[in-house]
Structures are given as structure tokens and as C-alpha cells.
Amino acid sequence: MTFTINNTNSTVFDSTNNENMTISEPVQPVSKGPKGITFSGETFIVPETHDMVKTLFDPTVKKSNFELIILSCLFSNLLVFLIPNNQIRIYIFIALYIFWRLSYNFGIGWLLQNQSNHNLLVSWSQKYHLFDPENKGALAQSIQNEIKSQRGENYDIKSMPVEFNTWLIFRKFVDLILMSDFITFCCVVYCSAIKDDYQFINNQSFWLVYSRIVLGSGLILFNLWVKVNAHNTIKDYAWYWGDFFFRQINNEELIFDGVFEMVPHPMYSVGYVGYYGFALIAKSYVVLAIAIFGHFLQMIFLHYIENPHIDKIYGPSKNEINLIKILKLKDLKNFDNLKPLVGLTNFNWMRASDIVNLVLSLTYGIIIPLFANSIKSLFILTVGMKLFESISINLSLTLQSYFKIVTKWSLSNDIPVEKSFSNWAVLYNSLINLTYSSLFGMNLGYFLQKSGSGSSSGGLLFSDWFYLRVFLGLLLIYTQFWINFSIIDSIGYFGWFYGDFFIPKSQSSIKNITTAGVYRYLNNPEQIFGVCGVMGIFLIYPTVENFVCVGLWVVNNFIRINFIEKSHMVKLYGEQEVNRDSGVTKTVKKHLLPEVIQRRMSNDEAYTRVNGTTHERRRRRSSNLHGNSVADSLDNFIRDLRNSSTKLSQQKLIELSQNLSFANSDYKLTIDGLKMQSTESDELKYTTIGTPVTVSWTSPTENHSVRDWIGLYKIVQTSYSRNKTILSSAGRWTWCKEPKGSFIFDKEKLFWEEGVYEFRYHLDGKHDVAYISEPFEIKSIELKVPEFKEDAIKFAENLKLEIFDKVIKLTDINEAISPIANQSDNVIEVYKLISSMISKSTKINITYKIFLNQGDDDLLSIKDVAIKLINIKHVLEELSYNITDKKDV
């Protein structure tokens, strides 16, 4: 329930489906109300609906048949309290809660997923005519009676779309599960609290009991505010997953308002803090455990059910997706086109700096603690390493910001600024790794020495609530990891490594700071959450040493963000751009501050904007990111045989393809335009990758069916089946509507890889084989890379003719590649295909990333590619031990 719709009379159209949607007149004339549209294009006025609390518990609202059943189910939980043994009651309510929670996440989840992908619920309604007044079946009548009991006797079921009526019934199913889930959880809380003579108020000091109750109640009230605010924002339509069934018109994108502007997915994140408030009040690890269990299942539900549907309905278009892919890959151009090491993530064994980082991390995190004599020495090492990292990084960033010392040194030594930035990223990450490895090593040493002495709690500032401390500590550590990855996802590796300090702004495609991702909610998410993992370690091991480390991490983080990064970002983007309110700030001002204070703050902000002295805020600039199968092995084996001294004859390949079995058949397939390897008759015919293949067919007129069809296959995948094709053609097929005809296989109808292939004629829309063509080979064209750049134009023309023209259409060798390639459904796959064809044709291996690291003004042309290949050849020849022995890279 995270669809953030602006109001009930608006929603979002899927840009991929709009062109196929036709809008008809409303089926029910209603004077007022939001307008809805089904996925088939039928429009209607959406009647008013009420939330589940009002419909179930408001005595002034008439109850429908299903609602009475739901209330009966809810009150039936009271029967469990007739059992005198409280422990048995706890077990029963836990079992009931697990049942309803699984029904929610996997029952409702399954229905919604299939409704989203296959329109399942609506199809059921149509299949069984559930809303047809003429259907007198028991199920249909009960469903229709339920609809009328909800909407009133005057409600015309047939005049409303089946999608809306199906949604009304689905809502009751949701009400039953959600309310039962919550009620059984509350029963677990109550039974756990009164266990052992009301243990939740016993065996603790007076102030601690009241602190728990007050804090827990605060969490519950905050949870209630989140739910109410969310419902007021998204209304019943999104609360009950309405856009799985139909859409509401006039809302073009997701709206971030209210609590949805405060945190991502509030219904699933902060929308469950009340569960932990109940656990705190009940003073029960059992309640805490089932709260974690329920919350975890909700996050799975969000990830696998809601997010895919949100992306499908509200997500970016194909062009936007292609752009995002390209920009994320462009972010790597400063790091040699490889994801840089962040911590130990993106580790690459072929990168020396990664191996050094791993060795140092293991040394400081494990080896040194194993041989250390005292915790004091480990503490000194950790503090020293943190001070060294803080001073060196902060000083380097300050000098670079004000004096550009790194850039000046790099340019004076003819080192590209991108390379100097890459070196800085390695240094920065290495120092960060050393500080966290030292911190981990200090705590490992503490654990080993205390375990060896037989005392596990000695030296701790407090030792109570161990399991709670571990849970909260691990939660804080996880939060830091999540925040860090969210930051990288929003601003890229460029922003993570302070790219604004090293790369000129004029060389970037983005001129403004990002307000996407986690930065939508917080201006500086790393201000606190960037070091909350250290706080988590302190909670788990609350020692003086860890407390000092927390102070060091927090102070350094505060100084770096507020006194170094902030001033640099203001210089780049200006104070007004940097100091805009975050989502959390806006929400607090709008919902939690009195109106008088809001007006006063608005006046102050207007004054400070005029005078250019807004409060401090900073954000890094975004870099505009928001085993081969057995058959393939056989194919490679055939190719290897062909290239070996023992040639595989055409006759043997024909036998392998079983073409001879159809020599006397009345059906015929002939392939036009194939070339001969040589004048020898036993050589296999071939064509080149991407070249269209024309196949002609002849079939007996009396036996011909318009559903006869031809498919293209690898012979190594079909050689075991002569009379029936079991393998899918994967779209490489065409109908044979006439007894005689021809068809050109090109583009997606072709295989774009080397191998030996055949065409198969199938009968009457089935997979029965009537004829198998002669085998033919698809292989790469051979292109020789010239020695000199003077020949680049002629070489580029060959590349255009033999490779590029088969994939994308360019007018000449000087036309930019990217604008044409970006028009495809998957630009990355296009680049991969072109780079693969070039590699096989020229025997110089390149990757698709060559098209992402483009030339001047980001307009890489075929001529530029030709020059790059010539340069690569020169480098390879110079590195070869024998200049006559050309290397295949």
C-alpha cells in the first residue's frame, strides 16, 4: 500500500500501454466523483468508499454480509480467553498470527501478483459471470448480494465495470486478513504482558517501567499518525491496491506528499514501529520476535509484489530506462569502466589495489587482534588510524577545494583528471577500510580476551538487555549499510568519492544537485546514519573504548560534512540550491509544527533568501543517476572441428541435420544467397552474421494449411529429433500461408552468433516436421584493421557496410552512433551486439563500453571507432614479443 496518489480523482497511466488504450464514455452517469479507467479503456465514475475501520466499527455505517462475517471472525478470538492456561493462549494466538500474516504476504501477495501480471481476479469474475444478474448460481448470487449490501439496493452492478466490482469484493478479503492479523497480534501482546502476574510492570524499577510505557506508547501513536496520514494521502483507492484493477485519471506521476515525503515506503518502514512499541510495553522478547517476523515478511511483500507493479504502472519509459543504464555505466568512466571498490564491495581479483585492501583489512581486523597483548594497544591503534584518516582526508579535500593541488599536479605530469580522481578513490576507500578494520579488530580482541578470562561482562558500561542490545545494534549496522548503498544508487560512485572536488563541472552532464532517492527525504543522510553502525557496535559492546570511537566518528563526520563539503557545494551550486528543505523538514513543518510557527519560519526563510544567508545544507552532485549450455558446447565443438586440420564435410553435416531423411518429400525448402567456402563441393555453404537470409518453400497444394510454418534452429539443438521439433523457435519463425512462397529472415528473426543452422517446415501450426533444409553456416565477416590512420576512412566504410548497417541505420561514417542506438528497446544489447561482431571480425576484442566512452561532445561515430581500433592494434603490436605474431586481445 505504497502508491502515493495525490487524491482519489487521479492516478497514472502506464506510458507503455497508453497507445493501445481507447477511452469510451462513462458507463454510469454520476455527477461527481473521480473518473476511473479500466485497462481495456472503459471509463466510469468511481463511487465513494470508506476505510476498513469505518466500515467495520462505525455503528452508523450499515454492515454488509461479508463485514458481519469479518466481525464474527474477529470477536471469535475472544473464545481463546476461555482457556485458563495463559501460556497455551499465547501459543494459540502466535499460531493464528502466523497464519494470518502468511495469508497476507503470500495469499494476498499471490493474488495481487497474478492480477498484475495476468489480470487473474478479473478473469475469474468474467469466467464465472459473478456480476451477471442472470446468473442464478449460489456463488454469483452471494457475491451480488454482498455488492448490494455494500452499495445499497439501488446500485446497478451491471452498469459498473467488472474490474471495479471485483475490487469491491477483494477489499473484503483484505479486511478479513488485515484485521485478523492485527487483532491476533494484539492478543499476543496482551497475553505476554499479563504473563507471570503482569510481568510487564514487575521486576523493574518504577522509572524504567514508566519509561517503557511512555516510549512504547509514543511509537504506537506515531505509527497511528503515519497510517492516518498515509490514508489521507492515498485514500482507499491505493490503500486497497486499486491500481491493480483499474486506474484513476489525471495523475501523471507518483506524488510525494505527507508521510510519503518523509520516508521511503512509510507503510512498510515506519508504519511498523508501533509493533516494536507494543513489544516494549509488553517487555516480551516473544512479541519482539513476531514483530520482526511480520515486518520482515512485509519487506518481502514490498520487494516482490508492490515494487514490480509500481515500476510497471508508474515506472520510466524504455527510453528513460536506456538513459539510466547508460548514465550509470558512464559513471564508471572515471574508474577504468569497472565498479570501484567500496569497502570490500565490487572486489576484483585482477585489481592490485583491491588485493592490497583485502590484505590490510584482514591484517588489522583479524591477525593483529589475535596476537595483541592488550586491548589498550588495539584501542590506541584504532584511535590513531581514525585520526590519521580524518586529518589526511579532510586536509586533502580542503586543499583540493581551495587550491586544486591534486588537479594541478596531475595535469603538470600529463595525467588525465579522471585518472587522478580514480587514484583518489582508491586512497579514500583504503583509509576508510583501515579505520573500520581497526574498529572491528579492537572489538574482536576484546571478545577474545574476555572469553579467555571467563568474564564476558567485565569492562562494560552496562550489561542488561543483551538480546535487545544485539537486535538494536545489528539494526543500526544494517541501516548504515543500507544508507551507504542508497547514497551510491542516488549520486553514483562519482558522488560517493567526492567527484565534485576533482572533476570540473563543465565536463559533467548534470548541473544541479540531486533530489532523488534517499536525498528526497534527507539532505545529508550520512550525517547521522553514515556512522550509526559504529553506534550499533557500541550498543552490542558498550565499552569506554567504543564510546570514544563513537565520538570520534560522529565529530569527524560532522566536521567533514558541515565545514568542508558544505562550503564546496555552496561554491558550486549556490546557497539557495543547497539549502532547500528536505522531505523530513517539510513534513515536520507542515504536520507537526503549530501554524503560527510555520508562518514565522516561512517569513524568516523569505528574508534569508533575499539576503543570501540561508541555513547550511550540502549534497554531493549526482552523476545523473537516479555456463554455456550443452548445445552451445556442441556448437563450439563443430566450429572447432571446422577450423582444425580435419574438416567436417558438408555431407556429414547434412547427415547430422537429418536433411537426407526428407530427400523424397513433396515439401521443399531452398535457401537463397548462401555463399560457398571454396570451389570444393564438400564445403558447407555460409552467410555472415546479420545478413538477411531468404528461404523459399514448396508444399503440396492439396495438403497445404495456412497454419504451416517455418522455423530457424541450430542443428546441434535439434539433431536428436527428426520428425518433431521439441525446441522453441524463440520468435525465429514465419507462417506459410500459400503453397509456394518465400520469406526474408532478418533482424530478430536471425541468430546473431556463429554456428551451423537449418530451417524446418512444420505442419498445421504444430511441431510435426515435413522437411528439413540443408545445413548452412553463419560466421563472422573478416575485416583487416589497417596499419595507418590514413586508411581509417576506408576501414570505417567497411565497418559501416559489414557490421553497423546490419544493426542500426547510419547515413555515413561521421554520424553520431548514440542518438540512433538509443531508439532501440535495449541500447546496451545493441552495443553488445556491435562490439561482439567487431571483435570477431577484426580479431581485436572490445566491449560495449567503448561506445559509452565517447568522443568530443559525446558524439562517437563509426570513424571514431575505426580510429580507436587502429590505436588498439598499434598498442598490441608494440606489446607483442614478436611483431609478426599479432595478438588477439
Swiss-Prot record:
<feature type="topological domain" description="Cytoplasmic">
    <location>
        <begin position="85"/>
        <end position="91"/>
    </location>
</feature>
<keyword id="KW-0489">Methyltransferase</keyword>
<feature type="transmembrane region" description="Helical">
    <location>
        <begin position="285"/>
        <end position="305"/>
    </location>
</feature>
<feature type="region of interest" description="Disordered">
    <location>
        <begin position="606"/>
        <end position="627"/>
    </location>
</feature>
<keyword id="KW-0472">Membrane</keyword>
<feature type="transmembrane region" description="Helical">
    <location>
        <begin position="528"/>
        <end position="548"/>
    </location>
</feature>
<comment type="function">
    <text>Catalyzes the first step of the methylation pathway of phosphatidylcholine biosynthesis, the SAM-dependent methylation of phosphatidylethanolamine (PE) to phosphatidylmonomethylethanolamine (PMME).</text>
</comment>
<feature type="transmembrane region" description="Helical">
    <location>
        <begin position="471"/>
        <end position="491"/>
    </location>
</feature>
<comment type="pathway">
    <text>Phospholipid metabolism; phosphatidylcholine biosynthesis.</text>
</comment>
<dbReference type="GO" id="GO:0005789">
    <property type="term" value="C:endoplasmic reticulum membrane"/>
</dbReference>
<protein>
    <recommendedName>
        <fullName>Phosphatidylethanolamine N-methyltransferase</fullName>
        <ecNumber>2.1.1.17</ecNumber>
    </recommendedName>
</protein>
<feature type="topological domain" description="Cytoplasmic">
    <location>
        <begin position="195"/>
        <end position="205"/>
    </location>
</feature>
<keyword id="KW-0443">Lipid metabolism</keyword>
<feature type="topological domain" description="Lumenal">
    <location>
        <begin position="399"/>
        <end position="423"/>
    </location>
</feature>
<keyword id="KW-0256">Endoplasmic reticulum</keyword>
<feature type="topological domain" description="Cytoplasmic">
    <location>
        <begin position="283"/>
        <end position="284"/>
    </location>
</feature>
<keyword id="KW-1208">Phospholipid metabolism</keyword>
<feature type="topological domain" description="Cytoplasmic">
    <location>
        <begin position="549"/>
        <end position="889"/>
    </location>
</feature>
<dbReference type="GO" id="GO:0006656">
    <property type="term" value="P:phosphatidylcholine biosynthetic process"/>
</dbReference>
<feature type="transmembrane region" description="Helical">
    <location>
        <begin position="174"/>
        <end position="194"/>
    </location>
</feature>
<dbReference type="GO" id="GO:0032259">
    <property type="term" value="P:methylation"/>
</dbReference>
<keyword id="KW-0808">Transferase</keyword>
<feature type="transmembrane region" description="Helical">
    <location>
        <begin position="64"/>
        <end position="84"/>
    </location>
</feature>
<feature type="topological domain" description="Lumenal">
    <location>
        <begin position="113"/>
        <end position="173"/>
    </location>
</feature>
<feature type="topological domain" description="Cytoplasmic">
    <location>
        <begin position="376"/>
        <end position="377"/>
    </location>
</feature>
<feature type="transmembrane region" description="Helical">
    <location>
        <begin position="206"/>
        <end position="226"/>
    </location>
</feature>
<dbReference type="Pfam" id="PF04191">
    <property type="entry name" value="PEMT"/>
</dbReference>
<keyword id="KW-1133">Transmembrane helix</keyword>
<dbReference type="InterPro" id="IPR007318">
    <property type="entry name" value="Phopholipid_MeTrfase"/>
</dbReference>
<feature type="topological domain" description="Lumenal">
    <location>
        <begin position="227"/>
        <end position="261"/>
    </location>
</feature>
<feature type="topological domain" description="Lumenal">
    <location>
        <begin position="306"/>
        <end position="354"/>
    </location>
</feature>
<feature type="topological domain" description="Cytoplasmic">
    <location>
        <begin position="445"/>
        <end position="470"/>
    </location>
</feature>
<feature type="transmembrane region" description="Helical">
    <location>
        <begin position="424"/>
        <end position="444"/>
    </location>
</feature>
<feature type="transmembrane region" description="Helical">
    <location>
        <begin position="92"/>
        <end position="112"/>
    </location>
</feature>
<dbReference type="GO" id="GO:0004608">
    <property type="term" value="F:phosphatidylethanolamine N-methyltransferase activity"/>
</dbReference>
<keyword id="KW-0949">S-adenosyl-L-methionine</keyword>
<feature type="transmembrane region" description="Helical">
    <location>
        <begin position="355"/>
        <end position="375"/>
    </location>
</feature>
<keyword id="KW-0594">Phospholipid biosynthesis</keyword>
<comment type="similarity">
    <text>Belongs to the class VI-like SAM-binding methyltransferase superfamily. CHO2 family.</text>
</comment>
<feature type="topological domain" description="Lumenal">
    <location>
        <begin position="492"/>
        <end position="527"/>
    </location>
</feature>
<keyword id="KW-0812">Transmembrane</keyword>
<feature type="transmembrane region" description="Helical">
    <location>
        <begin position="262"/>
        <end position="282"/>
    </location>
</feature>
